[in-house]
């Protein structure tokens, strides 16, 4: 069976490693391709069936999609792939021609193998690129094709609000994917513990990628600008054995982080401190690792303050950091100057897609 797995752009390799480790526990054969057909933020998984023995000793098939939905920290969606196609030139096609190509393709697919006529269905769509059609156009066209195909076998049931089966259609540049979205309408990165929303909160998937890149060894971990606590909470949920510390300047966000940690059941695992990261050495004498989503200045409209903020922060960080730091920001020039000026070395850099922005991730020591 084939699955299309979605994640954040720029962390495909880390997500692939996580999925590989999860599937190895099942003892099955599988192959994972990063960026299938050149599309970032996607993995293509082909895996054999997995089985388990129930309490009565009977052999049962294990749902790989359910297993990944329940255990992955880095994936956004788990989609059973029906088919994919490269539509050369579709970005230049007029809307009528583009939609016809999509409808003809979907009409040729055996969608009846993935949904019963007695089951309700809906189509959710995603589009990225320069096209003359919208995601709404795609959802409507794919829905029509599926409805017409299923009509050969009975009367199809459409339920746009609470469907039993969700078809997911994606058109990214000139590549089209169609599959069954087993994750549902809410992406996996939207954690159920998030009861307080910081205006610039970090996706949990990216937080986990940062944790992986830190290569933690059980030492103390600090988020010096912890916001709503995403990194700290995700780390605590891993049952991390080391000390976990969060510093946040604004009381409103600190209380929000504590509310989130309480909802996640890990409040007792995290030490929260109200404080200013530019005076870091007043709160901690030393820390092994620092991981943080630094302020970009975009939400508050104060980008001019960022270079000075970063310079002061890294000056303080140099006094307490023992091993490695992992940081993301949109402000490449400001952070690189602060890193160099305060004696740190960049040992890894990559660009990640986050909330419509391309952010820079740095691992420093």
Curated annotation (Swiss-Prot):
Residues 69-182 form the THUMP domain. It is found in: Cytoplasm. GO terms for molecular function: RNA binding; tRNA (guanine(6)-N2)-methyltransferase activity. Signal peptide: none annotated. Consists of an N-terminal THUMP domain fused to a catalytic Rossmann-fold MTase (RFM) domain. Its EC number is 2.1.1.256. Monomer in solution. It is an enzyme of class 2 (transferase). Pfam families: THUMP, UPF0020. SUPFAM superfamilies: S-adenosyl-L-methionine-dependent methyltransferases, THUMP domain-like. GO terms for cellular component: cytoplasm. One of its GO terms (biological process) is tRNA methylation. CDD domains: AdoMet_MTases, THUMP_AdoMetMT. The keyword Zinc-finger does not apply. S-adenosyl-L-methionine-dependent methyltransferase that catalyzes the methylation of the guanosine nucleotide at position 6 (m2G6) in tRNA(Phe). It comes from Pyrococcus furiosus (strain ATCC 43587 / DSM 3638 / JCM 8422 / Vc1). Keywords: Cytoplasm, Methyltransferase, RNA-binding, S-adenosyl-L-methionine, Transferase, tRNA processing. Belongs to the methyltransferase superfamily. SMART domains: THUMP. This is tRNA (guanine(6)-N2)-methyltransferase. The keyword Lipid metabolism does not apply. It catalyses: guanosine(6) in tRNA + S-adenosyl-L-methionine = N(2)-methylguanosine(6) in tRNA + S-adenosyl-L-homocysteine + H(+).
